[in-house]
Amino acid sequence: MKVLMINGSSNNKGCTAQALEIVAGVFKEEGIDSEIIHLGAEAYHDCTGCGLCRTKLNGKCVYDDVVNVLIEKAKSSDGFIFSSPVYYAHPSGRLLSVLDRAFFAGGKYFAHKRGSSVVSARRAGTTASLDVINKYFMINQMP
């Protein structure tokens, strides 16, 4: 079994990354392979709805960045954990931009696979943030 984890924070060594490292340690103890992709401080395009991913690019996004890497790795992954710090009661914009594009272009590679979410916050907003991330799982039939 392989689990792909996405750190939606701009800080590759922050609280969200630390939470994923703890999860990765538990997976290792249980014999489960895992990989963490850190989105980092790079800026990501939002989905423009051009549709080229479905009509001409065979499930790849027109913007050649980490989204296409994520889609490719999703093909061989059995489960996913999407994580984000909480900003104003919401997941990071970078995570949402990446997930919007990955699920639109390569949704079939996520469908019917396990999904979970992790958020980190100093104060409030965790429930709302988890709700936003978990909707990707519900919409894409991920138990």
List where the protein language model places each region.
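N-terminal beta1-alpha1-beta2 submodule of the flavodoxin-like/Rossmannoid cofactor-binding fold
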Residues: M1-A105
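Short, glycine-/small-residue-rich phosphate/pyrophosphate-handling segment
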Residues: G93, Y109-P143
